[in-house]
């Protein structure tokens, strides 16, 4: 029996649908239903359900975007850092394997030395490396409470990110989720609805690919640890717009901010993460996702507008 925390959220609902298609027995629990101080109650829930695995999709992202986290810092911290810590402790006590949906939004800009940011790179868009959004700070802290630490390495371009002992579960980094279903949380929908766009290059995660890759970690019993679960490659905002227009999803006149300074002055309350992640670790354990342009093409070919 898989316990799915955050089963009513954007990503959690899709995990549940995936489990149904796969015939995986699961029980959903809302992350909000837990008093984060009542660890005994959480432990008893997992015991009573005879859980064989825990997937944590619960977290606090802010609606409509991360700016909202700046106004609700207590709940943001609880959902993104306190809850993962409780899950680690309880699952450790019960010997239950777990997976936690983290975020690639703990990095920004280009990686020193080139290439995409790797799992063993310390976050550079965090409370320890400001400025950052409060959301990103709490997501980086969420990895810290799961046992990861920044370590200075002689001769390295950037500090490393290492577990304090041995990794105990899966940490899956999601990055700018999208799929074929029009939704306020879908990146492709956001691009179509924003009045003005910021030009940036990013890694993205197609949600069906993301969920299948996460579950494959359990199925293949790959080593515990952090995995960047994004579609290989990267894409710019203008490339996404071109694909949206190409597939006829929305042919409006798209406008862009002149630069990030104008974006921050007119449309944002907190800095944004724009980055590219390296996916070679996931591929190295035999888990492959479609290239990002292919995944975007497919999602827009099968686009389902909101009713």
What is each PLM-predicted segment?
Residues 1-22:
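N-terminal Rossmann NAD(P)H-binding glycine-rich loop of SDR-like oxidoreductase domains
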Residues 20, 24-45, 59:
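Adenosine-cofactor binding site in Rossmann-like domains, unifying the SAM/SAH pocket
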Residues 38, 82-86, 97, 136, ...:
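Conserved cofactor-binding/catalytic machinery of classical short-chain dehydrogenase/reductase
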Residues 39-81, 86, 92:
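NAD(P)H-binding glycine-rich loop region in Rossmannoid oxidoreductase-like domains
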Residues 71-78, 82, 105-172:
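Catalytic helix-loop patch of NAD(P)-dependent Rossmann-fold dehydrogenases
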Residues 213-269, 273, 298, 304-307:
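Mid/C-terminal beta-alpha module of Rossmann-like enzyme folds, strongest
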């Amino acid at each position: 029996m898989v316990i799915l925390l955050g089963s009513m959220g954007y990503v959690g609902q899709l995990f549940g649908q995936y489990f149904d298609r796969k015939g995986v027995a699961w029980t959903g629990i809302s992350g909000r239903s837990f008093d984060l101080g009542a660890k005994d109650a959480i432990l008893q829930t997992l015991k009573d359900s005879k859980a064989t695995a825990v997937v944590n999709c619960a977290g606090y992202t802010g609606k409509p975007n991360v700016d909202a986290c700046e106004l609700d810092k207590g709940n943001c911290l609880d959902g993104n850092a306190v809850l993962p810590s409780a899950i680690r402790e309880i699952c450790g006590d019960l010997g239950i394997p777990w997976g936690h949906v983290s975020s690639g939004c703990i990095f920004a800009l280009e990686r020193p030395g080139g290439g995409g940011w790797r799992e063993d790179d310390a976050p550079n868009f965090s409370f320890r490396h400001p400025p950052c959004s409060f959301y990103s700070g709490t997501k980086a802290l969420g990895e810290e409470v799961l046992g990861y630490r920044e370590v200075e390495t002689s001769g390295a371009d950037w500090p490393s990110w290492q577990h304090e002992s041995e990794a105990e579960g899966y940490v899956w980094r999601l990055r700018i989720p999208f799929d074929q279903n029009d939704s306020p949380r879908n990146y492709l929908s956001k691009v179509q609805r924003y009045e003005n766009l910021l030009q940036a290059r990013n890694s993205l995660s197609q949600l069906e690919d993301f969920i299948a890759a996460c579950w494959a970690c359990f199925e293949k019993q790959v080593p515990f640890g952090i995995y960047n679960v994004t579609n290989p490659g990267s894409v710019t905002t203008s490339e996404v717009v071109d694909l949206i227009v190409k597939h006829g999803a929305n042919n409006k006149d798209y406008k862009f901010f002149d630069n990030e300074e104008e974006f921050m002055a007119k449309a944002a309350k907190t800095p944004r993460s724009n980055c590219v992640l390296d996916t070679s670790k996931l591929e190295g354990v035999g888990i492959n996702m479609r290239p990002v342009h292919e995944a975007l093409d497919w999602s827009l070919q099968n686009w389902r507008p909101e009713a």
